[in-house]
Amino acid sequence: MKVTSKCSMTMANIAKPKEWYDERIAYLSEFMLPERFATMQRVVADRTRYMTVCAENTFHPQNASALVRHCEAFGVQELHAIEFLCGFQANLHIVRGTDKWVDIKRYGSTAEAVAHLKGEGYRIVAATPHTNDMTPDSFDVSKGKFCLVFGTEKQGISPEIMEVADEFIKIPMYGFVESLNVSACAAILIQGLVEKLHCGEVDWRLSPEESSELLYRWTRESVKDDEGILRKRFGEDF
């Protein structure tokens, strides 16, 4: 599994005490506009890993880009990309930098992605009509963490995902159209389910430790010569 991030992930993957991150955040914030840092603090407070998204072999860059933007806009911190048929390639003109704020985890097979997600305690929720499907209104977000899986543009959800899915979800249709494209479907489902989390009693936010680790990475993304600054002040070895 590969993790995509502009900022070096080496230190982020090592467990550090919350105080370690907070000390460096406080120092780096001195090199930022106060308004910018306040915005980051606000956004981190609304981030979640309780819900995540998985894209299976997304061919079109515009759809990959839209998925990244949807996740960022609605506070979903992680996006999982299965890439055994094609790479998950976002269009820079569409994402407009939002990929800096979302962690994209990449997998070479569906089995690898499912094993990781199941190992992290996620329910696999396939976005496709099914005999036992649910709608955003009827889906129970309180049953535990869940991952929304979106299939490829033409074939939809793969047989491998259909076999291991814990639940299925669809968007009710009332016209002649029987389906929406990946981007539209993702926007509706992600927004609807995030709204349910915000309105419910589920503890969906990041832990204090996760929030500090993420804010540390974001402040590093936003400060020029962050490595030099941290090395000079804290003696960091990158």
Please state what every model-predicted region is.
Residues M1-F238:
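Post-transcriptional modification and biogenesis factors for structured RNAs
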